[in-house]
Design a protein with these regions (language model features):
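Beta-turn initiation residues at beta-strand->coil junctions
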Residues: 1-4, 16-22, 40-47, 65-73, ...
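Aromatic-rich beta-strand edge motifs centered on tyrosine
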Residues: 4-13, 28-37, 52-63, 75-84, ...
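Right-handed beta-helix
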Residues: 9, 15, 84, 165-168, ...
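Short, ordered coil/turn segments that flank beta-strands lining enzyme active or ligand-binding pockets
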Residues: 10, 20-22, 34, 46, ...
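Hydrophobic residues embedded in beta-strands of well-ordered beta-sheets
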Residues: 39, 63-65, 85-86, 94, ...
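A conserved catalytic-core signature of glycosyltransferases
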Residues: 76, 153-154, 181-182
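A motif-centric feature for acidic-aromatic and gly/ser/thr-rich catalytic loops and repeats
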Residues: 90-156, 162
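Short linker/helix segments within small regulatory modules
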Residues: 175-180
Length: 187
């Protein structure tokens, strides 16, 4: 992105990101539920393209997205959750997630077990190389990557891999017995 402008609500949640890439301006707005979990994303592009995604979440422990729903109420993508994200069903095709020891998605496999897509990252989550064309937003550390903003959504806040930092402060106050936890922008 050439430039980005972020807007936050009173709870320090990102509610709007405006990104300019050359002459193209993209504005994304986000909504959250009462527990602070992201429930929707609306994208408006200066070329007239608009997209809406509602996230159907499982909030039983660590919030996981079960489905992405479009503006007509149609499921664009349905996820299967186990200990980690197991698979996605998108456009009538099922892809299974392959992970490394860090929990990052390093590949996708089809129903026959053939690897269709691969991903490799640097230490901060920047994508170094990818193969394949399957639509997939789950990548580094198994978290959602937003192509428009270049940010990872880690449920509580967003991380910019180009700087290796979060773009907002941690809501956790930290502990004087664990001094590094007092740094509001660390993971």
């Amino acid at each position: 992105a050439n430039s980005a402008l972020y807007e936050y609500n009173a709870e320090n949640k990102l509610i709007k990101a405006t990104v300019q890439n050359g002459s193209l301006v993209i504005e994304e707005s986000y909504t959250y539920d009462y527990e602070g979990n992201r429930t929707s994303k609306t994208t408006h592009r200066s070329d007239g393209v608009t997209e809406y995604v509602k996230y159907l979440n499982d909030n039983s422990s660590l919030t996981n997205v079960l489905a992405e729903i479009d503006e007509n109420g149609t499921a664009k993508c349905v996820y299967t959750i186990g200990a980690d994200l197991v698979s996605q069903e998108r456009n009538g095709r099922t892809s299974f997630y392959l992970y490394d020891g860090h929990g990052s998605v390093v590949g996708l496999a089809n129903e026959n077990g053939a690897v269709t897509d691969t991903y490799s990252y640097d230490a901060f989550g920047n994508l170094l190389k990818s193969t394949g064309s399957t639509e997939n937003c789950y990548r580094y550390c198994g978290e959602q990557f937003d192509e428009t903003t270049g940010l990872y959504y880690l449920r509580a806040r967003y991380m910019d891999t180009s700087t290796g930092r979060f773009i907002s402060q941690d809501s956790y106050a930290g502990s004087i017995f664990d001094p590094i936890s007092l740094h509001k922008y660390l993971y």
